[in-house]
């Protein structure tokens, strides 16, 4: 690292401390959703392989959760793999699944966070399913940030699965279709989502400059605030995180009003 890079790093850290010092902690979001985008483009820009980009993105996750732990954030949802990602070439998908499995095991072994899977288990390899179940069991007692790992996740699929779960639940209880139709409301459907009784995201961060949701938590983000960051996920810094919190705190949430 040359002198210019060292000086730039020092200035960024000083600026981050200044931003952090002016944060209103009463306005920190309780639930943050993250669309971690840009691993492949970061790798291409740095002359690295796609797999290296995914590994760099995976390594950023613990650092990010550490920043969240320094605030009053209570829930973080990380979108690690979408249902659409299964259409990627096998030479990319297979290593990516291995990297994600390593992430799950690392988060569970860390001991600071409670891990919960959101997504469709049926799409995942048996080894990944085992890792997720073991992570949930091993961290169920932890009184730290609840980390939703969205793996094999699609927003429309989640809603379809919620409706299916609701119908099956009614069938098990002997509820007629007529009675179910009369009793269905927003809260009932919400209870059958992957996130169940969790609070909806207050803030959704998407990296890489893309300004779209791509189906992320379609039901839960009806009143969420969004923050789009130009930085690719592997290059996401604490100062970028603090800027997102500052931007969120400055907004006036209307909840449709």
Regions found by a protein language model. Give the residues of each.
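Flexible, compositionally biased loop and terminal segments
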Residues: 1-257
């Amino acid at each position: 690292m040359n002198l210019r890079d060292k000086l730039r790093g020092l200035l960024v850290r000083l600026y981050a401390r200044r931003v952090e010092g002016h944060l209103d902690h009463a306005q920190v979001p309780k639930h943050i959703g993250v669309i971690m985008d840009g691993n492949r483009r970061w790798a291409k820009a740095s002359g690295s392989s796609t797999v290296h980009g995914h590994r760099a993105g995976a390594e950023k996750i613990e650092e990010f959760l550490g920043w969240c732990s320094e605030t009053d954030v209570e829930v973080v949802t990380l979108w690690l793999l979408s249902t659409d990602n299964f259409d990627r070439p096998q030479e990319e998908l297979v290593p990516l699944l291995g990297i994600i499995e390593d992430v799950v095991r690392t988060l569970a072994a860390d001991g600071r966070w409670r891990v919960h899977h959101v997504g469709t288990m049926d799409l995942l390899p048996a080894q990944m399913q085992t890792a997720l179940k073991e992570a949930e069991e091993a961290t169920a007692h932890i009184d730290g940030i609840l980390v939703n790992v969205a793996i094999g996740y699609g927003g429309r699929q989640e809603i379809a699965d919620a409706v299916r779960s609701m119908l099956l639940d009614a069938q098990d209880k002997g509820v007629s279709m007529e009675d179910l139709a009369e009793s269905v409301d927003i809260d009932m459907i919400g209870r059958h989502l992957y996130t169940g009784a969790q609070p909806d995201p207050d803030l959704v961060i998407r990296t890489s400059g893309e300004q779209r949701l791509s189906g992320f938590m379609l039901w839960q983000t009806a009143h969420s605030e969004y923050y789009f960051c130009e930085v690719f996920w592997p290059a996401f810094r604490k100062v970028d995180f603090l800027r997102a919190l500052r931007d969120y705190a400055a907004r006036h949430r209307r909840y449709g009003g």
